[in-house]
Curated annotation (Swiss-Prot):
Provenance organism: Brucella anthropi (strain ATCC 49188 / DSM 6882 / CCUG 24695 / JCM 21032 / LMG 3331 / NBRC 15819 / NCTC 12168 / Alc 37) (Ochrobactrum anthropi)
Gene3D superfamilies associated with the record: 3.30.420.40
Protein name: Glycerol kinase
EC number: 2.7.1.30
Reactions the enzyme catalyzes: glycerol + ATP = sn-glycerol 3-phosphate + ADP + H(+)
PANTHER family associated with the record: GLYCEROL KINASE (PTHR10196:SF69), SUGAR KINASE (PTHR10196)
Pathway membership: Polyol metabolism; glycerol degradation via glycerol kinase pathway; sn-glycerol 3-phosphate from glycerol: step 1/1
Residues reported to bind sn-glycerol 3-phosphate: 12, 82-83, 134, 245
Xref: SUPFAM superfamilies: Actin-like ATPase domain
Length: 499
């Protein structure tokens, strides 16, 4: 009797394979980091071959830890870092260039050209997205324009475009020997090439961006049997779920009703609110996106606030400044001071995402005096995540007209008690961490399990969700308002830094 579901979680810094049981509990997992490549300022790349090699490794290692074989796995789902873009040779399987990562800003000149001609919001009605360096379409355009032979191969159908999910699916299902070239609606919605209403590639946008349709994958639902895995360790297992990482976390957090919201604290922060089958356009700097689409059902949409730098700021303090040895030391250092000492850190390393969408912003530390020490800087770095989330939540309430009664939180930074309490204080709502914090991988597992009947319905997902910890607001409204207003002043100082 098959008892388990596998989930490939391919993130910005590492690849993991996690095996779940019917209750959504983790049976075994394995993780392997990959190199972050920085060829120039603002450029961030990954080696797709390294990611594929690491994926194979973690699958085999997790199965070995659990003492399981392929026949014990009912199906496998994939969740992935979104927007990260690559183009590879259909015949050889070799990437034509490294994967260009979601936070990479090399397309800023293209963005400037298009926004000058038609404004940043000219594609919002169709795609839900502003023209930005963030999304895949212009990253693909950059590859086509700058990699010798790429455009010719793409136009001939000899080069395949994909986000990371597409690359993994193609390799898992045979690669050059019959690999399936697909993506799901959630990942497609982040390319800025798909119409949110039709869930198809939009010919007008393809013409505008000068992208040949011959290189694009087929768009499928988030939960259906796509094919069988050919990898020896999972040979014959059905590949049955794909969700972009933030949509997967929404699904794994059981935010399945309109108005329910989650926030993932990782390299960046990503808050999504379920808006049901209704497409809600944003007037306050948020993104409209596809939350998920189950096989045969109507799509469910979401509002999203994307924040580029949160956990990455802690890594920067560790790697670039050396004021902490391990990322986990940040809370201890921040607790050496009673408050932020009126120091504010705006981590606009690659501009500001939601709700500002200012590519020209750059990071600043404001409010420094001789009194400030590294404890204040550590605390300001943590608080920066919470302030940015407050900005997004305020915009979400304005767009949706729905007051959020609690925020479901997940991701690596939720183990930081100081941050979670401050987040509850600055939002003035409870923050809830679930019992299982690996909600991104769990969401992909749920999508894959539903497709093969392992879980009968989304009701099973709701019943599996359990509270791990709940933080309640303890700060006065006057104090939280004072702190947030000072943060907003610091943000204004960061804007327009790049001419």
């Amino acid at each position: 009797m098959t008892q388990f579901i596998g989930s490939i979680d391919q993130g910005t810094t590492s690849s993991r394979f996690i095996i779940f049981d019917r209750q959504g509990d983790i049976v075994a997992s394995d993780q392997r980091e990959h190199e972050q490549i920085y060829p120039k300022a603002g450029w961030v790349e990954h080696n797709p071959i390294e990611i594929w090699r690491n994926t194979q490794h973690v699958i085999a290692a997790a199965l070995k830890k659990a003492k399981l074989k392929a026949s014990d796995i009912a199906s496998v789902g994939i969740t992935n870092q979104r927007e990260t873009t690559l183009l590879w040779d259909r015949k050889t399987g070799a990437p034509l260039y490294n994967a260009i990562v979601w936070m990479d800003t090399r397309t800023d000149e293209l963005v400037s050209r298009y926004t000058k001609d038609g404004g940043a919001d000219q594609l919002r009605a169709k795609t839900g997205l502003p023209i930005s360096t963030y999304f895949s379409g212009l990253k693909l355009r950059w590859i086509l324009d700058n990699v010798p032979g790429a455009r010719e191969k793409a136009e001939a159908g000899d080069a395949l475009f994909g986000t990371i999910d597409t690359w993994l699916v193609w390799n898992l299902t045979g690669g050059t020997e019959g690999g399936i070239h697909i993506t799901d609606v959630t990942n497609a919605s982040r390319t800025q090439l798909m119409d949110l209403s039709t869930l198809q590639w939009d010919e007008d946008i393809l013409r505008l961006f000068d992208i040949p349709s011959a290189c694009l994958p087929e768009i499928r639902s988030s939960s259906e049997v796509y094919g069988e895995i050919t990898l020896p360790s999972l040979s014959g297992v059905k590949l049955a779920g794909i969700l972009g990482d933030q949509q997967a976390a929404l699904f794994g957090q059981a935010c399945l009703e309109p108005g329910e919201a989650k926030n993932t604290y990782g390299t960046g922060c990503f808050m999504l609110m379920n808006t049901g089958e209704k497409l809600v356009p944003s007037n306050y700097g948020l993104l409209t996106t596809v939350a998920y689409k189950l096989d045969g059902a109507k799509p469910v949409y979401a509002l999203e606030g994307s924040i580029a730098i949160t956990g990455a700021l802690v890594q920067w303090l560790r790697d670039n400044l050396g004021i902490i040895r391990n990322s986990s030391d940040i809370e201890t250092l921040a607790r050496t001071v009673e408050d932020n000492g009126d120091v504010y850190f705006v981590p606009a390393f690659s501009g500001l995402f939601a709700p500002h969408w200012q590519d020209s912003a750059r990071g600043i530390i404001a409010g420094l005096t001789r009194f400030a020490n590294k404890g204040h800087i550590a605390r300001a770095a943590l608080e920066a995540s919470a302030y940015q989330v407050r900005e997004v939540l305020d915009a979400m309430v304005k767009d949706s007209g729905v007051e959020i009664t609690e925020l479901r939180a997940d991701g690596g930074m939720t183990i930081n008690e100081l941050l979670m309490q401050f987040q509850s204080d600055i939002l003035d709502v409870p923050v809830v961490r679930p019992k299982i914090i690996e909600t991104t991988a769990l969401g992909a597992a749920y999508a894959a399990g539903l497709a093969v009947g392992y879980w009968k319905s989304t009701k099973d997902i709701v019943e599996n969700w359990q509270v791990g910890h709940r933080w309640h607001p303890r700060m006065s409204a006057e104090e939280s308002t004072r702190l947030f207003n000072a943060w907003e002043k610091a943000v204004q100082r960061s804007l327009g830094w790049i001419e």
